[in-house]
Amino acid sequence: MTAQPYPVSEIVAAQRPHRRDAARNYDALLAAAREAFAENGAEASLEDIARRAGVGIATLYRNFPTRRHLFESVYADEVNELCRVAQDVAALEPWDALTSWLRRFVDYTVTKRAIREALNNESDVFLACRDSMYQAGGPLFERAQKAAEARTDISFDDLLRMVSGISSTYFPEETQRDRVLGVALDGVRTAR
């Protein structure tokens, strides 16, 4: 699978400042926001995010004029990474590539639940992220189907909705979530 630009890749590239010092601050803010949102949810303090990044609140607002801009930037950056993972796992056997990516997708969606819920599902950034995930994962699923390793009577949309349902469910232990995901994937795999 050759590297291809996804809609989200263009958004991430357009948002990131070109000056080295500004890019460093931007990256530090994204990392701090990821951490703060993971710990405190969507209501994490913007002042705390700026402090964690080692910048002033004015620098945060210069990069992200609103909380929504910050949510969208963190979300887009993470989806861009998820798309990169699809390219990385593409060299694996078809079923292994698909399941590796889907497991990463579940890990990603579980940790980004607060951000995802805070986003407007009709925003251009959200739609570009969704389209990018489909463009990244869809070929992995098609490859598994062509190799007769995945059922052909379901679509990638069906599969992603099922896996999204699992990732949006609260599990007291990660091992239980992994078991449930394994059972679901067994239902997608063709008989061997």
List where the protein language model places each region:
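Amphipathic alpha-helical interaction segments
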Residues: A28, D48, D96-R104, D158-M162, ...
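Short hydrophobic/aromatic patch on the recognition helix
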Residues: G54-F64
